[in-house]
Amino acid sequence: MLLAIDCGNTNTVFAIHDGTDFVAVWRTATEHQRTADQYYVWLQSLMQMQKIEVEITEVIISSTVPRVVFNLRVLCDRYFNCRPLVVGKPGCALPVDVRVDAGTQVGPDRLVNTVAGFTQFGGDLIVVDFGTATTFDVVDVDGAYVGGVIAPGVNLSLEALHNAAAALPHVDISMPDTVVGTNTVACMQSGVFWGYVGLVREICAQIKAERARPMRVIATGGLAPLFSQGAELFDAWVDDLTMQGLVTINSYNREA
């Protein structure tokens, strides 16, 4: 079976795919110091708890944190006896073209989202991923990745407010009941929520105007459901878009 690993700046997601569907999906904090042995013990304990008995024969990794990749490679070699595909590295081909100035600098998660978006929805697409950063990736009519936009992430903005202004508390993002807040927490939540609604709407509008044709907007990432409420920003929301993209890329390389 396939083990797909999506390592982001904040969280790392592990998913087992049986060729048809995901058998299990687990999320853990991204830690630079975690060893291959620790990863294996953690995975084995979760598999035993859920009574999952499978043999991992393939692994594919997307990582925006280069320091973590080494230990994940050791995990694959030591415990699964396989060499992983690593998106963005030699030996991992993509089923789409990358038409930007410096293709090697594009985050692998953005390329994976491009593949998944094109596979599910076709071209002329904007993929918005609400992660540590909020990214907008533009997929051409033929599926090629042609660039995008990177904005500060929602939680990053809240943390910046808290860290830079001594009087402002740490708050969690939520959809406010009203735009005008009547206390500090409500004011901060409203500013960040409606500020990001405006950011997403305007960036997508500018991309569509620049491309001069209709484009669908697809959302993914942990906070995408929140921004799908109360504001008509997206044509679709796909919770596991990145993991689906990893499965597609793995299949493409297996058949190549």
UniProtKB/Swiss-Prot annotation:
The UniProt record gives the binding positions of substrate as 107-110, 184
Q: Which CDD domains match?
A: ASKHA_NBD_PanK-III (cd24015)
Q: In which pathway does it act?
A: Cofactor biosynthesis; coenzyme A biosynthesis; CoA from (R)-pantothenate: step 1/5
Q: Which UniProt keywords apply?
A: ATP-binding, Coenzyme A biosynthesis, Cytoplasm, Kinase, Metal-binding, Nucleotide-binding, Potassium, Transferase
Q: Name one Pfam family in it.
A: Pan_kinase
Q: Name one GO biological process term.
A: coenzyme A biosynthetic process
Names of the cofactor(s): NH4(+); K(+)
**Reactions it catalyzes:** (R)-pantothenate + ATP = (R)-4'-phosphopantothenate + ADP + H(+)
Supply the name of the protein. Type III pantothenate kinase
